[in-house]
Amino acid sequence: MRRDAWIARLTPHRAALASLFLLVFPLFMPFKAIAVNILIQGLFALGFNLLYGYLGLLSFGHAALLGGGAYACGIVIVRFGMPWWIGIASGTLAGMLVAAGIGALAIRTRGIYFAMVTLALAQCLYFVAYQAVDWTGGENGLRGVNVAGISLLGVHLDIVRPLVRYYFVAAFVIAALFVLSRILASPFGAAMEAIRENETRARACGYDIAASRWLAFVLSGGFCGLAGALQAIHLGIVPVETLYYTTSGLAVMMTLLGGMGTFFGPFIGAGVFLLLEEVVSLWTVHWQLLVGAVFVACVLFFPRGLWGTLLAGHAR
């Protein structure tokens, strides 16, 4: 069997294979806190990759989607005393609502103009959060997002324990992977790829370009909002920097490291970036310079990303 045919046969099962890897990942990853961060940041990059990798829209405003979800979850839990599951649902919904608002204003622009509009709107949300001290904590962040124990189907889960917390987060990430797989396998997934490859031809085929872009942005916001909610529960705090433009840059970096337009690439990129950050920061306070150099080298020598290059090698 040709390798490309073998990969094609595995594609319908990619969500199951990715989920299996995430389930066994803690067995050979000794640092469980980093493993949880990889899950959350990978989910954030996955949301960005849906828009950039599969539709070709470069956004510099995805920090607003992550931060919107994180703040919504934190406010619901801290200010209103709601249970964790309402916090997570609120965070996911908030990410979609923020994306709907930003997308409605940005989707009719193109290229660098689209990126700049998303950046500007995201920075507006950052300054709103910075000033709304009573709700967001301002520059000190929203503290007290404490979820120590969770009762699920009569079973008490102590998510203070690192391994339990990992699988708690992994359950939502795995669900997101299956949702993404269904989206990509649907007619809408085919429409996204058609628009990315040739917008003029896609319009001639009857696709509503603006509506498709807006819907993709909203779906991307759902994944990012979920990541933000999980991050708020994991950290117990929502730093205002979550909304800052540098957070959007991390999504871009992790996606390009792993492989733009690949299913599991965002998690590979998140793992490489976070492990590099953890190791290099032990050696020098200038770790960002070295990690940036590694990123540039990867982009130059592996333009398809690490995971994308591996898949391309198997397809030959």
What are these regions (language model features)?
Residues 23, 41-42, 70-71, 92-96, ...:
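Residue-level recognition of pore/gate-forming positions within transmembrane alpha-helices
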Residues 1-43, 72, 79-87, 161-163, ...:
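Membrane-interfacial amphipathic/re-entrant helices at transmembrane-helix boundaries
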Residues 63, 88, 213-301:
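Transmembrane alpha-helical segments in multi-pass inner-membrane proteins
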Residues 121-158, 189, 307-309:
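Extracellular/periplasmic helix-loop junction at the C-terminal end of a transmembrane helix
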Residues 160-239:
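Helix-loop-helix "hairpin" substructures at the membrane interface of multi-pass membrane proteins
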Residues 80-123, 268-270:
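Alpha-helical transmembrane segments within multi-pass membrane transporters and channels
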Residues 26-79, 105-114, 118, 194-195, ...:
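Single transmembrane alpha-helix segments in multi-pass membrane proteins
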Residues 1-21, 141, 195-200, 204-212, ...:
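Cytosolic-side transmembrane-helix boundaries in multi-pass membrane proteins
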